[in-house]
């Protein structure tokens, strides 16, 4: 990722979507969450390389005197550091078999021509000669817009971006065209001619019924065969048993009829990427029980009495959505805004006996709600919102350092031991002695 941030930990969810947490506590872009889920692998924070991280690494080496007094430049020092980082990470096992990976996939974010991408593009230009042609394949993803007024697929943006990329010393081996409808043969041939690739190297990824159709789409267009040839991979061309199972799952997803609706009550509901992992978990759960998922996004501030005074229509619409859902999920969040609305939703779910799941702040607020309305502790609160409360049912943890925002939470995989065998949670986890889940929070329920 070419941004200057060291990691994704302090991003606003509105700007970059959710922050994805890895086993080792790395706070990374949500794309790494997609890679982990789709490939069933476990990544570390070093799998996410940002401009900020590489500059910090090189500057630290310079401060220690590792460059022996030389002037430190973007080329070769930054570019060499990028290449060494990639080579180092490419050898680290990422799945349970513990074997060294045969292929390393590198996603370079941003757009060709971005100033901040330049050191990375130059690094990979050099890299392709170091590792030889048969070990390097460059896939260029480009948008092929289709204005509704004319219906014509426009290839100019693709031509221009490929020309610019070639000018920087990288030639695409595959041009992957993202479009709303399948590419016409004439459009494919045009892209092939102007982008200096064969027509079979122009891959069309058009809109499909579900994301599970995309690997099947790529397989149909011979992408696997292309990789086997160009990278000389030592893999036998065999019947795709795995993709047959995958196709069954994609077909099952498209045939779902019964709907299950979940109200997601949060602060950042205007951008669904803010809760990407929660939404994916709900989708997978719905598919497992053969139901189509309908998520009703509810901004928690719309449930608060103040909204009834200012915008009664929004208030009633929000409550109508909540009441019509089969279950309620309150995800995590930071800060006091919208917390009273979440507590209102939690109280309603408890009284109506609606299935409810609280994650992170959602769970903490469920404890606050129960303390106030069942135990009668009217001022019960989290010390995050009311440090002077006489009933601090949620408190900050010993790991928390209030001074600095970045990297001051309980982060990454943590083991939780069950104290009692007959709890609801223990049964849900299959009567195990402990569970291991990933954490990202500064506060916990007061023991």
From Swiss-Prot:
Signal peptide residues are none
Q: Which InterPro entries match?
A: Class_I_gatase-like, CTP_synthase, CTP_synthase_N, GATASE, GATase1_CTP_Synthase, P-loop_NTPase
Q: Which UniProt keywords apply?
A: Acetylation, ATP-binding, Cytoplasm, Glutamine amidotransferase, Immunity, Ligase, Nucleotide-binding, Pyrimidine biosynthesis
- The active-site annotation reads 360 (for gatase activity)
What chemistry does it catalyse, as a reaction equation? UTP + L-glutamine + ATP + H2O = CTP + L-glutamate + ADP + phosphate + 2 H(+)
All copies of the Glutamine amidotransferase type-1 domain together span 261-447
Q: Which organism is it from?
A: Cricetulus griseus
- UniProt-listed Enzyme Commission number(s): 6.3.4.2
Name the NCBIfam families on file: PRK05380.1, PyrG
Pathway(s) this gene product operates in, as recorded in its UniProt entry: Pyrimidine metabolism; CTP biosynthesis via de novo pathway; CTP from UDP: step 2/2
Could you tell me what this protein is called? CTP synthase 1
Q: Which residues carry this modification: N6-acetyllysine?
A: 61
What Pfam families would the database entry show? CTP_synth_N, GATase
Q: What lineage, starting at the top, does this entry show?
A: Eukaryota, Metazoa, Chordata, Craniata, Vertebrata
Recorded GO molecular functions are:
ATP binding; CTP synthase activity; identical protein binding
Its GO CC terms are:
cytoophidium; cytosol
Q: Where in the cell is it found?
A: Cytoplasm, Cytosol
């Amino acid at each position: 990722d070419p941004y200057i941030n060291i990691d994704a930990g302090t991003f606003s969810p509105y700007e970059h979507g959710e922050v994805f947490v890895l086993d080792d506590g790395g706070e990374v872009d949500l794309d790494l969450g997609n890679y982990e889920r789709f490939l069933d692998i476990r990544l570390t924070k070093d799998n996410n390389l940002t401009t900020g991280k590489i500059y910090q690494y090189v500057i630290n080496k310079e401060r220690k005197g590792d460059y022996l007094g030389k002037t430190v430049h973007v080329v070769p020092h930054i570019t060499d550091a990028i290449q060494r980082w990639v080579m180092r990470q490419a050898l680290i096992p990422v799945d349970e078999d513990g074997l060294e990976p045969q292929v390393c996939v590198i996603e370079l974010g941003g757009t060709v021509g971005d100033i901040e991408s330049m050191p990375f593009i130059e690094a990979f230009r050099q890299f392709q000669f170091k590792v030889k042609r048969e070990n390097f394949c460059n896939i260029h993803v480009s948008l092929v817009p289709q204005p509704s007024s004319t219906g014509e697929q426009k290839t100019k943006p693709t031509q221009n971006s490929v020309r610019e990329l070639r000018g920087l010393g990288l030639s695409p081996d595959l041009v992957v065209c993202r479009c709303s409808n399948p590419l016409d043969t004439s459009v494919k041939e045009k892209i092939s001619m102007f982008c200096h690739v064969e027509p079979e190297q122009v891959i069309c990824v058009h809109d499909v019924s579900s994301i599970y159709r995309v690997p099947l789409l790529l397989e149909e267009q011979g992408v696997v065969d292309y990789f086997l040839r160009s990278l000389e991979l030592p893999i036998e061309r065999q019947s795709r048993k795995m993709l047959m199972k995958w196709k069954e799952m994609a077909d099952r997803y498209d045939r779902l009829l019964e709907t299950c609706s979940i109200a997601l009550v949060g602060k950042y509901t205007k951008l669904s990427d803010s809760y990407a992992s929660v939404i994916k978990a709900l989708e997978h759960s719905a598919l497992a029980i053969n139901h189509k998922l309908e998520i009703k996004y509810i901004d928690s501030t719309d449930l608060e009495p103040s909204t009834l005074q200012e915008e009664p229509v929004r208030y009633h619409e929000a409550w109508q959505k909540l009441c019509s859902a089969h279950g309620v999920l309150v995800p995590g969040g930071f800060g006091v805004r919208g917390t009273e609305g979440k507590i209102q939703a939690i109280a309603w779910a408890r009284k109506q006996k609606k299935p409810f799941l609280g994650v992170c702040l959602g769970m903490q607020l469920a404890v606050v709600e129960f303390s106030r309305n069942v135990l009668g502790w009217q001022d019960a609160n989290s010390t995050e919102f009311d440090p002077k409360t006489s009933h601090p049912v949620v408190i900050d943890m010993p790991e928390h350092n209030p001074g600095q925002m970045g990297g001051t939470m309980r982060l990454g995989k943590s083991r939780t031991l069950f104290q009692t065998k007959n709890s609801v949670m223990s049964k849900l986890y299959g009567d195990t002695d402990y569970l291991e889940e990933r954490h990202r929070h500064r506060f916990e329920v007061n023991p």
